[in-house]
């Protein structure tokens, strides 16, 4: 009887290489690195995996060299606290990024992974159909436009960011 079973629904049978999947991070990090060097800022990486943080740190160090800090959440400081203290949060397809938007914090969604792996469900705001780009998001890779979106959102105040995004 099928009522005594449960179903696990897998995503489409996508065959994606690790290098292809994480090329989105590499592309975005190169832009962030350029901006941070121009503005004299450090990039703070909000670590995702407590148990694999050395592996994650090494990934970022390879791209950013020494131009970053690495925050690991704890009982005293959660990922939400780290985001709340940031001038701007940038994400590719993190749930925490969308949560940060809903909390009214200046956030930029650079949802370029869908274009890279040919899967529209990675586009910004999916499943809602959104324009391919807006004042604080983009769903395709355009180096110069991404650069401009990040710089613009860093430079505007929170009130203007909210008025443009809500």
PLM features: residue spans?
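Short beta-strand/turn micro-motifs composed of small residues
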Residues: 1, 47, 91, 109-111
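Catalytic binding pocket for nucleotide-activated donors in carbohydrate/polymer assembly enzymes
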Residues: 61-68, 95-165
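Surface-exposed alpha-helical segments enriched in charged/polar residues
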Residues: 30-37, 84, 147, 151
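Donor nucleotide-activated moiety binding/catalytic core segment of transferases
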Residues: 46-103
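Conserved catalytic-core segment of nucleotide-activated headgroup transferases in glycan assembly
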Residues: 1-62
């Amino acid at each position: 009887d099928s009522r005594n079973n449960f179903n696990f629904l897998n995503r489409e049978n996508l065959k994606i290489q690790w290098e292809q999947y994480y090329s989105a991070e590499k592309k975005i990090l190169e832009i962030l690195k350029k901006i941070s060097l121009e503005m004299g800022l450090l990039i703070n990486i909000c670590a995702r995996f407590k148990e694999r943080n050395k592996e994650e740190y090494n990934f970022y160090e390879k791209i950013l060299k020494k131009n970053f800090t690495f925050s690991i959440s704890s009982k005293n400081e959660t990922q939400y606290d780290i985001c709340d203290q940031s001038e701007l949060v940038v994400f590719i397809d993190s749930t925490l990024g969308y949560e940060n938007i809903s909390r009214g914090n200046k956030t930029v969604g650079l949802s370029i992974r869908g274009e890279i792996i040919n899967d529209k469900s990675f586009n910004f705001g999916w499943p809602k159909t959104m324009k391919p780009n807006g004042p604080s998001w983009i769903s395709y890779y355009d180096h110069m436009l991404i650069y401009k979106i990040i710089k613009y959102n860093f430079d505007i105040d929170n009130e203007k960011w909210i008025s443009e995004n809500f």
